Curated annotation (Swiss-Prot):
<dbReference type="GO" id="GO:0002181">
    <property type="term" value="P:cytoplasmic translation"/>
</dbReference>
<dbReference type="InterPro" id="IPR014726">
    <property type="entry name" value="Ribosomal_uL2_dom3"/>
</dbReference>
<dbReference type="InterPro" id="IPR022671">
    <property type="entry name" value="Ribosomal_uL2_CS"/>
</dbReference>
<dbReference type="InterPro" id="IPR014722">
    <property type="entry name" value="Rib_uL2_dom2"/>
</dbReference>
<feature type="region of interest" description="Disordered">
    <location>
        <begin position="224"/>
        <end position="257"/>
    </location>
</feature>
<protein>
    <recommendedName>
        <fullName>Large ribosomal subunit protein uL2</fullName>
    </recommendedName>
</protein>
<dbReference type="InterPro" id="IPR002171">
    <property type="entry name" value="Ribosomal_uL2"/>
</dbReference>
<feature type="compositionally biased region" description="Polar residues">
    <location>
        <begin position="41"/>
        <end position="52"/>
    </location>
</feature>
<feature type="region of interest" description="Disordered">
    <location>
        <begin position="30"/>
        <end position="52"/>
    </location>
</feature>
<dbReference type="InterPro" id="IPR005880">
    <property type="entry name" value="Ribosomal_uL2_bac/org-type"/>
</dbReference>
<keyword id="KW-0689">Ribosomal protein</keyword>
<dbReference type="InterPro" id="IPR012340">
    <property type="entry name" value="NA-bd_OB-fold"/>
</dbReference>
<comment type="function">
    <text>One of the primary rRNA binding proteins. Required for association of the 30S and 50S subunits to form the 70S ribosome, for tRNA binding and peptide bond formation. It has been suggested to have peptidyltransferase activity; this is somewhat controversial. Makes several contacts with the 16S rRNA in the 70S ribosome.</text>
</comment>
<dbReference type="GO" id="GO:0003735">
    <property type="term" value="F:structural constituent of ribosome"/>
</dbReference>
<dbReference type="GO" id="GO:0016740">
    <property type="term" value="F:transferase activity"/>
</dbReference>
<dbReference type="GO" id="GO:0019843">
    <property type="term" value="F:rRNA binding"/>
</dbReference>
<dbReference type="Pfam" id="PF00181">
    <property type="entry name" value="Ribosomal_L2"/>
</dbReference>
Length: 276
């Protein structure tokens, strides 16, 4: 999909750059593959804010997307590509030979009429899914499982991908876009190709209201708050915060390591680049 640049006929259109979605399905999603969705406003079951600056936005329905791809050796035809408000990538409606319908993450270069299939030995083309052990080294993949049968967890956002760089003693070595190099069991599934909508990062909303439609509220810096609200708050006039950058709860930020999952440390060969 191309980017759509707007002429400044109104102040809010000046500088606005959006994704041109004219090739996507303009109707409603398949009702049997959707479910109602309640907004949390960033609050948990106690009513406390667990994710700040979230709230409002247009009402959405959740689309069931097949991240597992366990329908082996049944060819499916792509009926159409659709917009999904729950993710940055586009989704593809697939109709299998037995009549079943399913949504999958749409990879780049996939279009209506193409055929996709999942299996132990299938063609290396975008949209096909297979175990990492059957994929040639050097292939670009997405929607990668971390645990066999649990469904894809890595490389699912718009434009993302990972590269299979090696295989050794039942494990596959995956290089992520962050620079991290990690190993995954060879039985885990992955889908060929990179995720659709790579221009998502080049969008420019143009006005605050467009972010509010997406459920994003204004993001306030700590230095403009009061001392009761943030460690950087307070002071007469504009201040720099007076201390090293911390979160609202006093923990160091900007490069501070927070990873605590020691159980899977052995599966990470090289940590991601942090810019420090």
């Amino acid at each position: 999909m191309a980017l759509k640049h707007f002429n400044p006929v109104t102040p809010s259109l000046r500088g606005t750059v959006l994704i041109d979605r004219k090739e996507l399905w303009k109707g409603k999603p398949v009702k049997g593959l959707t479910e109602g969705k309640n907004k949390s406003g960033g609050r948990n079951n106690h009513g406390r804010t667990t994710s700040r600056f979230i709230g409002g936005g247009h009402k959405q329905s959740y689309r069931y997307v097949d991240f597992k791809r366990r329908k082996f050796d049944v060819v499916g035809t792509v009926e159409r590509l659709e917009y999904d408000p729950n993710r940055t990538a586009f989704i593809a409606l697939v109709k299998y030979e037995d009549g079943e319908l399913a949504y999958i993450l749409a990879p780049q270069r996939l279009k209506a009429g193409d055929q996709v299939v999942a299996g132990a030995r299938v063609d290396i083309k975008p949209g096909n899914a297979m175990p990492l052990s059957a994929i040639p080294v050097g292939t670009i993949v997405h929607n990668i499982e971390l645990k066999q049968g649990a469904g894809g967890k890595m490389a699912r956002s718009a434009g993302t991908y990972a590269q299979l760089v090696g295989k050794d003693s039942g494990y596959a070595q995956i290089k992520l876009q962050s620079g991290e190099l990690r190993v995954v069991r060879g039985e885990c599934m992955a889908t060929i190709g990179a995720v659709s909508n790579p221009d998502n990062m080049n969008q420019h909303m143009g006005k605050a209201g467009r972010s509010r439609w997406l459920g994003r509220r204004p993001h306030n810096r700590g230095v403009v708050m009061n001392p009761v609200d943030h460690p950087h708050g307070g002071g007469e006039g504009r201040t720099s915060g007076g201390r090293h950058p911390v979160t609202p709860w006093g923990k160091p930020t900007k490069g501070y390591k927070t990873r605590v999952n020691k159980r899977t440390d052995s599966l990470i060969i090289r940590r991601r680049k942090t810019g420090k």
